[in-house]
């Protein structure tokens, strides 16, 4: 007994674990003890990874619980966690042995109370109102009779059937349905993409762009309708160039899209009624207007006919109008033969008077005087001044021609002298002049050879002298001989004949 009490190493009978073993035991104990649980708290940090998984914290005034919702479970959430929102999450606790941490895998999120959702809604509402998204001047007028109506809703619910039935009763129109999820975490992004998608269509394209958009959903709780309170939906609605009618929930339900849309309808059926008029009412109105126009035209014709009759009765009779002109014509007709005879007689007397004053002798004298005058003028016209002037002009032309020939010859001589001087200078500066003094140019093909090393490496050499070029074969040499010192060139007799070696 004393040996047991005096054991210097107590606790040796306690089990021993490795770090991995104890982490696994903690994980199994944690998951087996708690199972599926519900935790209430305020959403803290929210982070969505590139993989699609959602990471966030649930906290109270003393502790923080890390939560994870996997990518495949996000679409099943009725409410997407947002920072500051009080929620109740449902899932299972688990532990990560690698870091000795535990967290909660959440597959269901519910708002802890409608008060929290309403507070978040009021916060978003105030923010969007401050940006001017609810301003009345931003509202676009609805087309009176749209040719194509785009409907964004669930394709399988009663909402689309009610809208199509109401449109068919009032005024059948072409309808394009963009199917979306109207509940859950995917609802808001799908509705926003549908609004943007309708606006991106080309008018008159294969899939024509609608003239009016209806966003519709049936009634439900605030959690069910929460997708239409998301900021992404409100901003897509505000950015739409196509007029938009919102018909979400019942008449007592109001969402953010209702404030931003161009018209809020209490129900989807009411949205269809706002979209198109009643065809029968239009036909009745057209018939009524046609009848009114026909009556007005008939009254106008009767009035014009009555005025025409009154004016016709006020006009004088045609016989009365023509009586005076007829009398005047008769009087003129009676005087016309006598007037013609008198005019002819007066013309004959005038012609006789003029013919009596014309005598042949007078005419001959006038012609003779004109001929004498012409002869006098001809005698005074001589060619001597013209001939003298032409002679002077010819002498001047000869002098100018001689001067021009002399100047041209002088200019040509100067150009020839200048060209000869340039040719002599070119010959002096050319390497050909150097070759004539005993030098040579060695080439390997087109390349110059300037050293013995280059000559040994060359396959074939060509040497250019002043009087021609010949080819030589390059032979390898094992001994290097010094090149003979070139003789100093003789001084030229005249400075003008010295060349230049480049």
UniProtKB/Swiss-Prot annotation:
Coiled coil: none annotated. GO terms for cellular component: cytoplasm; exodeoxyribonuclease VII complex. GO terms for biological process: DNA catabolic process. Keywords: Cytoplasm, Exonuclease, Hydrolase, Nuclease. CDD domains: ExoVII_LU_OBF (cd04489). It is found in: Cytoplasm. Its EC number is 3.1.11.6. Residues 474-502 are annotated as: Disordered. It catalyses: Exonucleolytic cleavage in either 5'- to 3'- or 3'- to 5'-direction to yield nucleoside 5'-phosphates. Residues 474-495 have a biased composition (Low complexity). GO terms for molecular function: exodeoxyribonuclease VII activity; nucleic acid binding. Heterooligomer composed of large and small subunits. Belongs to the XseA family. Bidirectionally degrades single-stranded DNA into large acid-insoluble oligonucleotides, which are then degraded further into small acid-soluble oligonucleotides. This is Exodeoxyribonuclease 7 large subunit. It comes from Ruegeria sp. (strain TM1040).
